[in-house]
Amino acid sequence: MSPVKVFGHPMLTNVARVLLFLEEVGAEYELVPMDFVAGEHKRPQHVQLNPFAKMPGFQDGDLVLFESRAIAKYILRKYGGTAGLDLLGENSGIEELAMVDVWTEVEAQQYYPAISPVVFECIIIPFIIPGGGAAPNQTVVDESLERLRGVLGIYEARLEKSRYLAGDSITFADLNHIPFTFYFMTTPYAKVFDDYPKVKAWWEMLMARPAVQRVCKHMPTEFKLGAQY
């Protein structure tokens, strides 16, 4: 049995992030599925793994971690060298490492807050509200799209200068965008990316990666209560 266990549902963005980096480095792992609709993540045994009662929980031997971005960094530091990957830029020099850090922060502090409300309003809230069919709050969507366009404009300028966000090699900063952007691209607003050709080409390169495809096949493009995900 693999010493690495991921507790959660693969359709959830933060679980998908952890699975993505495990797939990138080729690490052996066990996914322990959890039914979030039934509230399994709130049960005492899971709270021991994640005190905030969120998913994922992560266990590697005696080590227990939570927070998906932190887990992903741990995975890369433990297994990335064996896989011949330097996605954190730690072996590339201090300037390269700094650029990875900058764009990792941009994803978490600028991109995620802009794109996630659209995903929540269009996909997640209608899915979790009893009875389904809840209409998105269009004011929230419109304000978020305006903010997202501003962020994408900055990305477009950056990607005119380099193949990826932190330079000409793919890094942790790029791959962190996968989970929420994947779901955003299933909303009626996916065409926003068409106005930013460099960004769209970058996104298509990310989606072409085998590890990304393996993880995204477990992320549904339609959500229905009672469906088996």
Curated annotation (Swiss-Prot):
Q: Which GO terms describe its biological process?
A: glutathione metabolic process; response to toxic substance
Domain GST N-terminal, which positions? 2-83
Q: Which InterPro entries match?
A: Glutathione-S-Trfase_C-like (IPR010987), Glutathione-S-Trfase_C_sf (IPR036282), Glutathione_S-Trfase (IPR040079), Glutathione_S-Trfase_N (IPR004045), GST_C (IPR004046), GST_Phi_C (IPR034347), Thioredoxin-like_sf (IPR036249)
Instruction: Name the top EC class.
Output: transferase
Query: Which reaction does this enzyme catalyse, per its entry?
Result: RX + glutathione = an S-substituted glutathione + a halide anion + H(+)
Q: What is its EC number?
A: 2.5.1.18
> Disulphide bridges in this chain?
none
Per the database record, which ranges form the GST C-terminal domain?
93-223
- How the protein is affected by changing D195E? In strain: cv. Fidel
The record, for Gene3D superfamilies, names: 1.20.1050.10, Glutaredoxin
Q: Record's CDD domains?
A: GST_C_Phi (cd03187), GST_N_Phi (cd03053)
- Keywords of the record: Transferase
**A Pfam family matched by this chain, by name?**
GST_C
Task: Give GO MF terms, alphabetically.
Answer: glutathione binding; glutathione transferase activity
Task: Indicate the impact reported for T171S.
Answer: In strain: cv. Fidel
- GO cellular component terms given for this protein: cytoplasm
Q: Which residues bind glutathione?
A: H41, K42, K54, M55, E67, S68
Membrane-spanning segments:
none
Please describe, based on the UniProt annotation, the reported consequence of changing G226R: In strain: cv. Fidel
Q: What induces it?
A: By pathogen infection.
The record's family statement is: Belongs to the GST superfamily. Phi family.
Main function: Conjugation of reduced glutathione to a wide number of exogenous and endogenous hydrophobic electrophiles.
Listed name of the protein: Glutathione S-transferase 1
Q: Which organism is it from?
A: Triticum aestivum
Classification from the root reads: Eukaryota, Viridiplantae, Streptophyta, Embryophyta, Tracheophyta
Gene that this polypeptide is encoded by: GSTA1
